[in-house]
């Protein structure tokens, strides 16, 4: 009887340890997938790959500029941004993020990061600020449904690539 209790106790302890170990691994895996989705979106802008950009966003996703006299700009459809990106010739804008901070709760995530934007063929930073990406996890993985961004032209520091 004592050996049965010991075995049961060991099995329960192993099961609990497995669950506890799996949770951080899953969270870390989700965090990597979130950063990867945002990176793919920005890579799509730089390479003008509209298919790559579309693969990272949900239908109806929006961009909301934050700042200016009213504090909040008019939202614009990310589909429109993708279309304009695809119509350009040559490389697209080079938007880079640094030290992303990811927060996850169930199927909702945010990624907050400092960004710089450099125009094609230029080395000078055109503008910088903070991007906040909101993502949802669905059957097809993590997808962007909204981007909020501040933007300024002064006080920008370079991101080491």
Describe each PLM feature range.
Residues 46-87:
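N-terminal, post-signal-peptide region of Sec/Tat-exported proteins
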Residues 128-158:
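Short beta-strand edge/turn micro-motifs at domain boundaries
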Residues 22-55, 59, 160:
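Short, low-complexity N-terminal intrinsically disordered segments enriched in polar/charged residues
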């Amino acid at each position: 009887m004592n050996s049965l209790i010991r075995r049961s106790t060991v099995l329960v302890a192993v099961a609990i340890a497995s669950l506890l170990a799996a949770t951080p691994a899953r969270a870390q895996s989700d965090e990597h997938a979130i950063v990867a989705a945002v990176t793919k979106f920005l890579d799509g802008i730089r390479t003008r790959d509209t298919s790559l950009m579309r693969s990272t966003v949900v239908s109806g996703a929006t961009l909301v500029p934050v700042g200016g006299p009213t504090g909040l700009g008019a939202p614009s459809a990310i589909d429109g941004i993708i279309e304009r990106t695809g119509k350009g010739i040559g490389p697209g804008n080079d938007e880079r993020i640094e030290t992303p901070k990811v927060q996850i709760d169930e199927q909702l995530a945010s990624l907050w990061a400092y960004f710089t934007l450099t125009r094609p063929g230029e080395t000078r930073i055109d503008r910088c600020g903070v991007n906040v990406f909101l993502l949802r996890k669905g059957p097809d993985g993590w997808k962007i449904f909204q981007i909020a961004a501040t933007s300024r032209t002064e006080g920008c520091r370079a991101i080491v690539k």
